[in-house]
Amino acid sequence: MKTIRAILNGKKAGNPELRDAIMKMRDRGVDVQVRVTWESQDMPRLVKEAVTDGIERIVVAGGDGTVNEAASALIHIDHESRPELAIIPLGTANDFATANHIPDSIADALTLAVEGQALSVDCVKANDRCFINVAAAGFGAEVTAETPVELKNFLGGGAYTLTGVVKALGFKPYDGSITIEGGRYDGEMLLGAFCNSRLAGGGQQLAPNAMIDDGLMDLTLVRPFLPHELPKVIEEINNPSEKGEFVKHTRASWLEIDFPNPLPLNLDGEPYHSRKIRFEVQPKSLKLVLPKDCPCVTH
């Protein structure tokens, strides 16, 4: 009998569709063992418990925050003992699952979790934290699934709304330095996006070419601009390069940011503030169950 350990976000544990899918999978002879998280320290404890019990595959059911909790817990497990990870997307925003073509149907996602192949993928450490999807800084840290669509449009390419929105909501640029392999950026930043995968903020495409197994982050930095410079900004958003005047795009395996004041940041949607942060890709550090048509792996 095949055994998997399902760890459910407590807010989703009563989902009737999820319960039905688990029961049907058990009827097929799969031993689906269920655990539930209620508090922030539950995930690390339950992951350690699974390792002690010899579980080889963990399935987490929840949103991007739950996936982040699981990845963060797994990265602290010795590599040889680290279970594989599968995902049932149940959040408000399921950006990582969506980008990687993990089914949004609970039954189909559970079937993939049981039958799918695990591939080695990267995660990114940010000081003592980690993320598997996207870290957004500055203005970008405010962009979540609940953000008004006018604000999110900027990250989807509709930058014509940005100037008015920034003025209306009083966003101010952040002044500091960013050091990456082969370069350094000093000055004001409106938005920083450090991407392992492609989507954030409820489906906004931040890094359309990012791969989760290439050992690199896709980085986008946007510096402040004046209203008459907006056409140039839009052009650079649509045609990102390292040489953009306002929008700079590059790839790197590590970067360090140093700001006089703590920079607002979110890691897979989870808030984090720090003045100095080192981001470092952990290549192929997790084994993740993915569909065969996943566009974010090099195959």
UniProtKB/Swiss-Prot annotation:
GO terms for cellular component: cytoplasm; plasma membrane. Keywords: ATP-binding, Cytoplasm, Kinase, Lipid biosynthesis, Lipid metabolism, Magnesium, Metal-binding, Nucleotide-binding, Phospholipid biosynthesis, Phospholipid metabolism, Transferase. Its EC number is 2.7.1.-. It holds the Pfam family DAGK_cat. PROSITE patterns: DAGK. Mg(2+) binds at residues 211, 214, 216. It is an enzyme of class 2 (transferase). Binds 1 Mg(2+) ion per subunit. Ca(2+) may be able to substitute. GO terms for biological process: phospholipid biosynthetic process. Residues 1-130 form the DAGKc domain. SMART domains: DAGKc (SM00046). The active site is at 270 (proton acceptor). It comes from the Bacteria. ATP binds at residues 37, 63-69, 92. GO terms for molecular function: ATP binding; lipid kinase activity; magnesium ion binding. It is found in: Cytoplasm. Its cofactor is Mg(2+); Ca(2+). InterPro entries: ATP-NAD_kinase_N, Diacylglycerol/lipid_kinase, Diacylglycerol_kinase_cat_dom, Lip_kinase_YegS, Lipid_Phosphate_FormReg, NAD/diacylglycerol_kinase_sf, YegS/DAGK_C. Belongs to the diacylglycerol/lipid kinase family. YegS lipid kinase subfamily. Probably phosphorylates lipids; the in vivo substrate is unknown. This is Probable lipid kinase YegS-like. It comes from Vibrio parahaemolyticus serotype O3:K6 (strain RIMD 2210633).
